Amino acid sequence: MTKQPEDWLDDVPGDDIEDEDDEIIWVSKSEIKRDAEELKRLGAEIVDLGKNALYKIPLDADLRPAIELAQRIKMEGRRRQLQLIGKMLRQRDVEPIRQALDKLKNRHNQQVVLFHKLENLRDRLIDQGDDAIAEVLNLWPDADRQQLRTLIRNAKKEKEGNKPPKSARQIFQYLRELAENEG
């Protein structure tokens, strides 16, 4: 006859007094596997980062070399190294690592949003001309009106002549410089 979990608790001698702090939390095997798989995905996400972004993540002395090694390894060895990184992450507090990753992703998302706004502004500058230039000057008073007009005029000529949009790219770069100098 095999004992069930309830029977195990009854056989403990001197356990007549119940203590609320000694409560046992049962965790299913599949939940443990899900947590391990999630940490392995977190490790893979860290491994996929570039070197500059990797140094912004708080990693200890054992984990950083394992991640740098995984970045150099290919194929099957990489999979095994990712499993090792997942195992190492299970023994650590991963919350600071997750927060740093979220911060990096958020910064990237903010840049994407800014680039979309600048692209829309560039398109309005090419289509509307002086009205959009006034908007740019309201946003960035130190913008050079003459340079913008020249770039817009050249961009319109390139667009009409079906030439590569060199001036449109220059407008975007100029707007990006203005936005970066502001912030």
Curated annotation (Swiss-Prot):
SUPFAM superfamilies, alphabetically? PSPTO4464-like
In which domain of life is the source organism classified? Bacteria
Q: Where in the cell is it found?
A: Cytoplasm
Kindly give the NCBIfam families that the UniProt entry links to this protein. PRK05255.1-1
Coiled-coil positions: none
GO CC, any one term = cytosol
GN (gene name): darP
**Using the chain's own numbering, where are the disulfide bonds?**
none
List GO molecular-function terms, semicolon-separated.
ribosome binding; rRNA binding
| Name the UniProt record assigns to this protein | Dual-action ribosomal maturation protein DarP
Q: What does this protein do?
A: Member of a network of 50S ribosomal subunit biogenesis factors which assembles along the 30S-50S interface, preventing incorrect 23S rRNA structures from forming. Promotes peptidyl transferase center (PTC) maturation.
- Assigned keywords, A-Z: Cytoplasm, Ribosome biogenesis, RNA-binding, rRNA-binding
Q: Which family does it belong to?
A: Belongs to the DarP family.
One of the GO BP terms on file? assembly of large subunit precursor of preribosome
What organism is listed for this UniProt entry? Shigella flexneri
